[in-house]
Amino acid sequence: MGSIDTPPHLPYRLDGKVALVTGAGRGIGAAMAVELARCGAKVIVNYARSSSFANAVVDEIKSLGSDAVAIQADVSQVSQTVRLFEEAVQVFGGLDIVCSNAGVVSFGHLSEVTEEEFDRVFSVNTRGQFFVAREAYRHLNSPGRIILMSSNTADSFTVPKHSLYSASKGAINTFVRCLAKDCGDKKITVNAVAPGGTVTDMFHETAKDYLPNADKMSKEQILQIVANVSPLTRCGYPIDIAKVVCFLASSESEWVNGKVLGVDGGAA
């Protein structure tokens, strides 16, 4: 009897899938978008303000042989989030994966935090992500993937003057556990990644808030200090987070649900 040749299974492939990544114009979001495309997905590249960065990501994705479009929307505004999803499902005929990456950083001692700063941080990092998840549930194909963005500072890695940001991300950890229950009827999994310090194009701008006297250090000195926080003695980069996101987006992650995956090299 002749054997029937079957092609080998290639893990983490996303061929035929459509992904939406919020805050995908630069940094971790851009790396997510490109890596999802590298795995075969078509990608909606969301951005709030800078179309030039988003269009550069679209061009890079197209150079890989996949397809992408950029759509502007500020996810701190629920009406714009609703519009984003309505437009996104029209582009490639549906959505299979939603990655909520848009966020803002904040530093301030308890005595200095204003109502305006509180609202700014929570409107994007917490409220914004919640309503991205709501619209994802409404629009995702079944089975689907929702991947939210937390932080290692939301749990066991505390930083002075970082309470607003940390708490805004801590809420995401609770969302993930609860929303996984709500989304089960559509076979949609809900997880989050929790990066540590990650070297992006904005890394050195924010280092002064994380490290004492960073304004007096060279870039090399800052990188060495950050590398030593991890037992692996290296810095984290956007691609490190993007690879984990691609796993969570794939069929291989089907039995991972309601979890927050730390991606910080063991720093926390």
Swiss-Prot record:
Q: Which residues form the active site?
A: S150 (proton donor), S151 (proton donor), Y165 (proton acceptor), K169 (lowers pka of active site tyr)
- Record-listed E.C. numbers: 1.1.1.-
Main EC class of this protein? oxidoreductase
Swiss-Prot/TrEMBL GO biological process terms:
secondary metabolite biosynthetic process
Which one of the record's GO molecular function terms can you name? oxidoreductase activity
Keywords noted in UniProt: NADP, Oxidoreductase
Q: Which residue pairs form cystines in this protein?
A: none
**Which residues participate in NADP(+) binding?**
I28, D74, N101, R134, Y165, K169, T200
Protein name per the record: Short chain dehydrogenase AgnL6
**Species whose genome carries this gene:** Paecilomyces divaricatus (Penicillium divaricatum)
